[in-house]
Design a protein with these regions (language model features):
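Structural signature of extracellular appendage/secretion-system components
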Residues: 1-199
């Protein structure tokens, strides 16, 4: 009797067979996922678990690379009321949450995206806070953020970080000193930025 199984379930048994199909996800598993990634489903309605320990071969390898997040999910951080937590520039904050059910502990694309996003978020927040605390070279106004999100986005990620267009147009808006009493040539804000390297 000729038999082919996949994930512990029968695909072909003699002349009988079960069909599989793909369906785009309505919701993202990780906040940084591409929209409408595909899930595999049995046409019979039976559950096809992409994250089952019994899944192997090329399909498992592809799922691990596409969905591998080291047992974590990247999601938007919320407070006890369910409201989004925002950074000092008003961007939604991402966090990684450990959830092993229906998941893979392989370090695939989502894992490295999450690590990059965390680095970018920390870097941009630290640099922006230093610059916003300082004054422009003429001492008349506070500095503005160096890093912002691209238009029509509300979360600082490796994909959408950009240099503030206001600074591209007018570099005089960049903070260079910590107070009006500091001389123009001192540029002590740059020293504060340099110290971030060791923090």
């Amino acid at each position: 009797d000729f038999r082919v199984s996949i994930n512990g379930q029968t695909l072909v048994a003699g002349y009988d067979y079960n069909k599989l199909y793909t369906e785009a996800r309505a919701d993202k598993r990780n906040a940084s996922d591409a929209a409408a990634l595909y899930d595999v489903k049995w046409e019979s309605g039976q559950n096809f678990n992409l994250y089952s320990p019994s899944l192997g071969g090329q399909m498992k390898a592809l799922v691990d690379i596409r969905d591998g997040c080291n047992g974590e999910f990247e999601q938007y951080k919320v407070d006890e009321n369910g409201d989004y937590i925002l950074d000092s520039d008003g961007n939604k904050v991402l966090e990684s949450v450990l959830r092993n059910e229906q998941n893979t502990d392989f370090k695939g694309i989502p894992y490295y995206q999450s690590q990059l996003n965390q680095f970018i978020s920390t870097l941009s927040e630290s640099v922006n806070n230093v610059l916003k605390s300082g004054l422009t070279s003429d001492g008349t106004q506070h500095g503005i953020s160096l890093f912002v999100t691209q238009t029509n986005t509300d979360t600082m990620t490796a994909l959408n970080i950009t240099v503030n267009p206001e600074l591209v147009k007018d570099a005089d808006k960049l903070a260079t000193r910590s107070s009006a009493a500091t001389g123009q040539a001192e540029a002590d804000i740059m020293e504060q930025l340099r110290k971030l390297q060791s923090e």
